[in-house]
Amino acid sequence: MKFFYNICIVGCGGTGGNFAARLSQFLSTSESKAEVILIDGDYVEESNISRQPFISGELLLNKAVALAAAIEDTYAYEVKAYPHYLNNIEDLGNAWKVFSYSSEYIYVDNEKRKLVNILVGCCDNHRCRQVMEKFFDKNSSLIYLDAANEFSEGEIVIGIRMNNRLLAPSRKFYFPEVMRSRGKRKSEESCGAVNIHHPQHLATNCFAANILLTIIANLITEQKIDGGMVIFDTFQYSCLFRKYKEDEHLGQ
């Protein structure tokens, strides 16, 4: 069976922007079939340029729109932009409607393919994560990758739901405080304020982006993915995968 991948990237900053560029380069030379949507309501600010994939000529442009245009210019690969914040699950549902295909099985170039939906969270806001967590719970089949990092350390959680069965849990299983956060939504907080509260490093963002690319590339080329959590520390040159085991739920 051949596959078609709907890949939705939420957040086009340091991790999401670098991941989107690497993913598009990979897909542009791959025989695989996929469609990519970038979601971000932020606009490019001067403070973004040091560690995010933007240039001074893109100041004040929407990040998703600017990144989509840059990717098409660089790799001749078209991605779609959804230049809005995700304040609730309906917002993410509306973004998902931008994808060309939604049926479980589709025909592309006269070939039958199974549709695989992938949500990649690259935001630094728990309120946005709450939206993605609810979307993951609501969908019968969805692969949900969520990346988070500080200056050097971080983790990527791989949640998998297939045919109404939870094969691997999402971030809230490991970090339940995510769902309790009542902080500002991203639409209520400037990117500059976020940078002050959560300082990050270009190398760390690129490290996280490369891990995300490895996970997706392995899925697309080998049809293999394991649920669990990747824990990394950029400046200790370390990366460890903790595979999810079903008996972990028994301890909850």
Regions found by a protein language model. Name each.
Residues 2-15, 19, 114-118, 123-252:
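Glycine-rich phosphate/adenylate-binding loop
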Residues 3-31, 37-45:
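Glycine-rich adenosine-cofactor-binding loop
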Residues 23-27, 53, 136, 220:
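Active-site catalytic pocket residues across diverse enzymes, especially alpha/beta-hydrolases
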Residues 29-33, 222-225:
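Phosphate-handling active-site elements
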Residues 33-78:
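Glycine-rich phosphate-binding loop and adjoining beta1-alpha1-beta2 segment
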Residues 49, 86, 149:
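Hydrophobic pocket-lining residues within nucleotide cofactor-binding pockets
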Residues 59-115, 123-127:
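A structured beta-alpha segment of the ubiquitous adenosine-cofactor-binding alpha/beta core
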